[in-house]
């Protein structure tokens, strides 16, 4: 039979089998389950599959991360701090540790309010114990920054209550040294009602192309309702300017995803 001549797709070596099993273990199937959460939370279940979730849910995620690293490299200053606010599993911090070892005494700090995410990040960066510090904290009035050369928010501001965004951005502005920079990657709304739904549909097509079912996409959208609250890009840029930043520009855009440098 013809099928018998087809090459086997089964993993042949032990290393390949381990890699396959790891991929299955860390694959995002949270919204496949009929008992999937009705409200999205950054708990241990999400932390376990979060890297896969980002890769399959955020268009051009790696390219955007690399752009962010390049900005941080340009802004990195000895004896100053680079903060990743909402660091999740520490993927950006891992890239940074590999990219800026030549700049002495730059302090990398990951901040997240999810203990599960912080634990995952600590494990991921266990080979770099002296390079990165972690803080479990909410980004509210009580959080204090050290003198910063760069502050990054990767798809984090969209989860902050809208009324708390302006004071947080003001605090970020005041924490940056002269010449420091703020890098903001964010899900946004179209400026035009007519295009908004098309952007959403194209994003759903992207997810389908990365293995998510229609049901998973729908259930996740419902779970994120009032948890992830995107604004129009013009509104977010206005908030950044009102915080004190005089130079604000878009360095990345994919339909309803944008990257800002300020």
Q: What is the role of each PLM region?
A:
Residues 188-241:
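C-terminal alpha-helical "lid/dimerization" subdomain adjacent to the S-adenosyl-L-methionine
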Residues 152:
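A conserved beta-strand element that flanks and buttresses the S-adenosyl-L-methionine
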Residues 36-39, 44-64:
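Class I SAM-dependent methyltransferase Rossmann-like catalytic core
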Residues 179-187:
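Conserved beta-strand signature within the Rossmann-like core of class I S-adenosyl-L-methionine
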């Amino acid at each position: 039979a013809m099928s018998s001549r087809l090459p086997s797709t089964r993993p042949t070596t032990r290393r390949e089998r381990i890699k396959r099993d790891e991929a299955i273990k860390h694959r995002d199937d949270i919204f496949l389950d009929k008992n999937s959460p009705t409200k999205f939370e950054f708990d241990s279940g999400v932390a376990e599959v979060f890297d896969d979730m980002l890769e399959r849910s955020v268009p051009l995620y790696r390219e955007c991360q690399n752009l962010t690293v390049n900005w941080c490299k340009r802004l990195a200053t000895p004896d100053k701090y680079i903060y990743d606010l909402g660091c999740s599993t520490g993927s950006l911090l891992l890239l940074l540790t590999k990219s800026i070892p030549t700049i002495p005494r730059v302090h990398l700090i990951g901040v997240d309010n999810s203990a599960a995410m912080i634990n995952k990040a600590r494990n991921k960066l266990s080979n770099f114990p002296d390079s990165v510090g972690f803080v479990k904290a909410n980004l509210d009035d009580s959080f204090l920054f050290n003198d910063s050369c760069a502050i990054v928010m990767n798809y984090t501001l969209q989860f902050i209550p809208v009324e708390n965004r302006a004071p947080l951005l003001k605090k970020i502005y005041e924490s940056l040294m002269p010449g420091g920079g703020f890098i903001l990657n964010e899900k946004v709304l179209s400026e035009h009602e007519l295009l908004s739904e098309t952007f959403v549909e194209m994003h759903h097509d992207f997810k389908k192309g990365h293995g998510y079912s229609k049901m998973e996409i729908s259930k996740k959208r419902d779970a994120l309702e009032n948890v992830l609250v995107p604004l129009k890009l013009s509104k977010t840029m206005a908030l950044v300017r009102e915080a004190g930043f005089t130079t604000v520009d878009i360095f990345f855009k994919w339909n309803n995803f944008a990257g800002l440098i300020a």
